[in-house]
Regions:
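Non-heme Fe(II)/2-oxoglutarate
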Residues: 1-75, 96
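A generic structural micro-feature
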Residues: 80, 100-104, 169-173
Length: 192
């Protein structure tokens, strides 16, 4: 499922301001950029960025409302959606994200500033690698799906899907927001 984020220009400005602070940590004497390695081979904020930045919390609440409206409209059995974690990624030239999954009910990626970077968002059908024949004319299997997105696009997908990002080929910073959501059930269900 995908949609265009309402108020994209507002959110883009808010997120870019956070990244500006992160990029100038010596001046501001504040940074949440982490040192430990993960699948994101770029700069990112911590997984709990909704607790650290009011703008990220507001954005997250707006996104959850859109997801809840979609779930209600489509009649999915998901009475309560909770944020598990969210963070910002910014990719400089040659930065990328290795294929991975999150093991949650829903994952979201909000593409804030991605156009003209040459980087592609990819879904993989599985975690297997395949061998290809050396001959010129050989059969190819399609285990990878490239998703073309524009600035302002939000993708919502099963958190178990393997996905990744190819390297940023430009000098322009590629910026995304990512979140993992879980379904929760009330203690007492009203109906089945």
């Amino acid at each position: 499922y995908s949609f265009m984020m309402p108020n994209h220009e507002h959110w883009s400005k808010e997120i870019k301001n956070i990244i500006l602070v992160e990029e100038n940590k010596d001046i501001h004497k504040h940074s949440t950029v982490l040192d430990e390695a993960c699948n994101v081979k770029a700069k990112r904020t911590p997984w709990d960025s909704h607790y650290r930045y009011p703008a990220v919390l507001s954005l997250t609440k707006d996104l959850i409302k859109i997801v809840e409206d979609f779930i209600k409209k489509e009649d999915f059995d998901a009475p309560l959606i909770k944020i598990e974690e969210c963070w910002l990624n910014w990719y400089n030239k040659d930065n990328y994200t290795t294929p991975h999954n999150h093991g949650v009910h829903l994952s979201l990626v909000y593409f804030i500033d991605v156009e003209d970077t040459g980087a592609k968002f990819l879904f993989s059908k599985n975690n297997c690698y395949s061998l290809e024949k050396k001959e010129k004319n050989h059969t190819r299997c399609n285990n990878v799906r490239e998703v073309n997105v524009k600035n302002g696009t939000v993708l919502m997908f099963n958190g178990n899907l393997t996905h990744g990002v190819t390297p940023n080929l430009s000098d322009q910073t590629r910026i995304t927001y990512a979140a993992n959501l879980v379904v929760q059930y009330m203690e007492k269900r009203e109906d089945y």
